Amino acid sequence: LQIQDSGKIILKDLDETIQSMKELAQKHKDTVCIGRSHGIHAEIMTFGVKICNWIDILERQRANFIHALDEIRVGQISGPVGTYSNIPPEVEAITCKKLGLMPARVSTQIIARDYHAYFMQSLALIASVIEQFATEIRHLQRTEVLEVEEGFGKKQKGSSAMPHKKNPVLSENLCGLSRVVRANSIVALENIPLWHERDISHSSAERIIFPDSFMLVDFMLNRFNGIVKNLVVHEKNMLKNTNKFGGIVYSQRVLLKLIEKGLTRE
């Protein structure tokens, strides 16, 4: 029940973050920038298209999260080893219905922990894609690129030793927190192989990984939403970087024309 209530908060965070990303994509649908593969200039695209890719990724994780939230909506009152030896299945059915849960199809003294591990993977995926977006912002904020910057408050300080610097500290923070959520998801996987019909080795770990992961993902989504809303986009630098090597980014068009004339790719 706590997972279901916490899940509603995460869904709200996801919806708000996706909406902010859609507004950013719409604003920069015609903002020309260079696309990169392997970190190297590839072909021209728009910054709006880049953000649309992020939106698609996060919307997919939203759908995955809803599915995982539904999968873990199970309960059981089936006795010490799941045989209903001292309590009829009707009690389980009535209780679960009142709580908005589905009775587990088969259970022991507890619900199998693969349910919980699957759910934790959905949180880890959300954290990981947020890290993906944050990493891109960090790369684009590098001095020699400087296509975007995190918003910088009037009273905010840069480096304590080098005050000219504006470090992407918020995005760096998100990358670090993502590692913690992923580590928690590994713990959830390790909770699956319990002894026989149950032991409590999973219990102590779950008391940490579930509340911590929910709080971390909630924090990460809210922080990333703030980054998106306050993102400074340097359109002139995007255009400058796009034209940095002249027309070399059109090499594929030239290649295709040469192939049409009978030349080989080699």
Identify the meaning behind each predicted range.
Residues 3, 7, 51, 112, ...:
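Amphipathic alpha-helical coiled-coil segments and their boundaries
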Residues 1, 58, 89-90, 249-253:
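A generic alpha-helix surface/boundary motif
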Residues 12, 22, 43-194:
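Internal glycine-rich alpha/beta core junctions
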Residues 26, 97, 259:
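Short polybasic/polar patches that bind polyanions
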Residues 2-5, 49, 117-125, 253-261:
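Short, well-ordered beta-strand elements within core beta-sheets of diverse protein domains
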Residues 162-266:
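Glycine-rich cofactor/substrate-binding loops
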Residues 6, 10-13, 17, 54, ...:
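Alpha-helical packing segments of well-folded alpha/beta enzyme cores
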Residues 1-42, 101-115, 196-203:
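Long, non-coiled-coil amphipathic alpha-helical linker/lever segments
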